[in-house]
Amino acid sequence: MKQEEDRIHSLVRREKGELLAKNELVSRSVIRLLIRDAIEAMEKAYAPYSHFKVGSALLTIKQKVYTGCNVENAAYSPSNCAERTAFFKAISEGEKDFAAIAIVGGKDGILQDYCPPCGVCRQVMREFVDPRKFLVIVAKSEEDYLVYFLEELLPISFGPDYIE
């Protein structure tokens, strides 16, 4: 019963857009800024085939933001998601410590629903973050968003610690 109550309280906190206590770096105002940056990144998406545009904004521990958008290709396999674009961009600049990522997306760039990361992006995130502390923010707007720990989106995950 206690576990079920905790799960319900966690869902209520998330639905209200309140942060879970494990990540002190990310306030509500920071979340809104990340969502705004993700929306701007989404506008740059190249999605001529699916018309589903996605943007992301990745926050480092040093409070620097790297944005990404999805880039499609006619062969589909070489396409890249917004989340991976942001991570690869940050890593190519020497960043290694990340706090959160905000993700938005929708058909023709219209935000109608939450846009969770695909399985490949979840696994890429897992490579570079502590899934118990890293926040994944999925948003419809700056006021309407859900916050998860990566661990909740990718339970029982395989990561670098398994092969070290």
Show where each model-derived region lies.
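C-terminal binding/interaction regions
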Residues: 2-47, 95-164
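Compact, glycine-rich, soluble single-domain proteins
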Residues: 70-84
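Alpha-helix C-terminal capping segments
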Residues: 59, 89-95
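Short beta-strand scaffold segments in enzyme catalytic cores
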Residues: 51-60, 102
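Short amphipathic alpha-helical face segments that pack within enzyme cores
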Residues: 81, 85, 120-123
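Short, well-ordered amphipathic alpha-helical segments that serve as non-catalytic structural scaffolds
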Residues: 37, 82-90
